[in-house]
Amino acid sequence: MVEDILAPGLRVVFCGINPGLSSAGTGFPFAHPANRFWKVIYQAGFTDRQLKPQEAQHLLDYRCGVTKLVDRPTVQANEISNQELHAGGRKLIEKIEDYQPQALAILGKQAYEQGFSQRGAQWGKQTLSIGSTQIWVLPNPSGLSRVSLEKLVEAYRELDQALVVRGR
């Protein structure tokens, strides 16, 4: 089981779709060697060094957290049903209401659209929010994603810089 890493006062909570089998096997988020999450958040400025999956708890030192929409591990995210994503969205809203980070970053348009019953999502900041928490949709860093590392870093950096502008 991959546990959430959450605390009050976070700048951002990154929300993946669900754990892959590598993460489920190790208990660490974004654990597959092809997953670019740790490299991207470092290059985008969220951390001052590239953390390893087994150092995930250190995200809290940078006022970052991680969670997921669905607990069930799969090989690919497309194995998750729309019903599971929608139910996960309801649970996620409760978590975010409890912790109220400055931003919630949903990693993937489909995850956001299905989890929050939205259509036509664009990358970046959304008009929908949860209390004072901004919702952002960022490209998924999975190794299966066709988005280039450069584009991932650019999208994540936009969020990091927006939080700096907000004074967080």
From Swiss-Prot:
GO cellular component: cytoplasm
Pfam family for this entry, one: UDG
One GO BP annotation of this record: base-excision repair, AP site formation
EC number of this enzyme: 3.2.2.28
Keyword Transcription: no
Subcellular localization, as worded in the UniProt entry: Cytoplasm
Major subcellular site: cytoplasm
Biological function: Excises ethenocytosine and uracil, which can arise by alkylation or deamination of cytosine, respectively, from the corresponding mispairs with guanine in ds-DNA. It is capable of hydrolyzing the carbon-nitrogen bond between the sugar-phosphate backbone of the DNA and the mispaired base. The complementary strand guanine functions in substrate recognition. Required for DNA damage lesion repair in stationary-phase cells.
Protein family membership: Belongs to the uracil-DNA glycosylase (UDG) superfamily. TDG/mug family.
Oligomer and partners: Binds DNA as a monomer.
Descriptive protein name: G/U mismatch-specific DNA glycosylase
Species assigned in the record: Shigella dysenteriae serotype 1 (strain Sd197)
